[in-house]
Amino acid sequence: MAATKPHINLAVIGHIDHGKSTLVGRLLFETGAVPAHIIEQYKKEAESKGKGTFEFAWVMDSLKEERERGITIDIAHRRFDTEKYYFTVVDCPGHRDFVKNMITGASQADAAILVCAAPDGVMQQTKEHIFLSKTLGINQLIIAVNKMDAINYDQKRYNEVKEEVSKILRMIGFKPDQIPFIPTSAFKGTNIAKHAEETPWYTGVTILEALNALKEPEKPTQLPLRVPIQDVYTISGIGLVPVGRVETGIMKKGDKVIFRPGIDGVGHAGEVKSIEMHHEEIPQALPGDNIGFNVRGIEKNLIRRGDVCGHVDKQPTVAVEFKAQVVVLQHPSAITAGYTPVFHCHTAQVACTLTQILATLDPKTGGVKEQNPPFIKTGDAAIVLIRPTRPLVIEKVKEIPQLGRFAIRDMGQTVAAGVVMDITPK
């Protein structure tokens, strides 16, 4: 098992049609994860459908319907190796209605490549995805200023886009001077694996060099076990196989685990019989591992996506109510107490009611600006009380940060994002 190299989950984010899937396809090709003959086959198929430049993107968009529509829907996991790490790519969809996939996808990422097309520059989703990455705790970014071939590798335009992106990064607390900006053409392979003659003015790293230079994520093995469930399968002859990513802690064969809240809100316990990753059985699973595990002692209809698996002696927290700090990213009017949008936290999606707005904060100092304001609006940071309409596992961001973040969606868009400060447990 290639577990000898450290593992990094990589999100690829950015506006639609800026070249995310093509970049991922190119990375897989350049690192030998996808054989050349498969790319050839895709190329022929793409040309026959009149989409000649799409062959690299097709590696990721292997769902038939997506190929026809030319967009990425579900989050595709693919793996590739560099000298130093092995990566699982979480290819995050860029279409507006898929931002919630982006939320569950990015919350699994240790680092992200933000793809911004040079001809267009910063678009709505470019901003949204940078905001979300920050809220969801992605601290390592690489910026690919892509489609440089479409602007004849013009340095002036590259610098303009770099400045546009830097402005947004600064606004939310990233330091642009510590982030690599790379002029790329994913389609042509410019500055992906090797330095390109087309950009003699650029002396920085390639995408692969930037990936190798990422810091290894610290594995939160000492925290309690938490595995948010993505899917639950029943496999004949084996039984119940939940699938998810270990966020914190360690899971071993023989562990007694509990899934909360469960369909009926009471939680269900069982025993781990085996654990698989990349179709190979492993003795234990660590944070960052995407696993399927066989559990005995639980009926199949009792657990579902959005439940969280933990050890019986340190169970996941089900919240009756929680206090959170939120940032309103975009809302057409004002948000008042009683507002009930959908909260996306790890793999769960639950409608929650904002019961009280306790205070607004001054974004510069973090201090209280106003106590008990009547409403909050776009751009505001606030402390609020929230009550889920059905049982939801969520943790304090100070205790288990991976499960202490959430995004709020309404009207097909991400309205706000936030972190959990305190919980009234069930």
UniProtKB/Swiss-Prot annotation:
- Assigned keywords, A-Z: Cytoplasm, Elongation factor, GTP-binding, Hydrolase, Magnesium, Metal-binding, Nucleotide-binding, Protein biosynthesis
The transmembrane segments are: none
Where on the tree of life does the source sit, at the highest rank? Answer: Archaea
CDD domains per record: EF1_alpha, EF1_alpha_II, EF1_alpha_III
Q: Which residues bind Mg(2+)?
A: S21
Q: What is its main location?
A: cytoplasm
* Chain segments carrying region G5: 185-187
Q: Where is this region: G4?
A: 146-149
- Gene Ontology MF terms in the entry: GTP binding; GTPase activity; translation elongation factor activity
Q: Where do the record's region annotations for G3 lie?
A: 91-94
Location within or outside the cell = Cytoplasm
Q: Name one GO cellular component term.
A: cytoplasm
Q: Which of this chain's residues are annotated to bind GTP?
A: 14-21, 91-95, 146-149
Keyword Protein biosynthesis set for record: yes
For this protein, the Enzyme Commission number is: 3.6.5.3
Q: Which HAMAP family match?
A: EF_Tu_A (MF_00118_A)
Protein name stated in the entry: Elongation factor 1-alpha
**Per the UniProt entry, what species is this protein from, by scientific name?**
Methanocella arvoryzae (strain DSM 22066 / NBRC 105507 / MRE50)
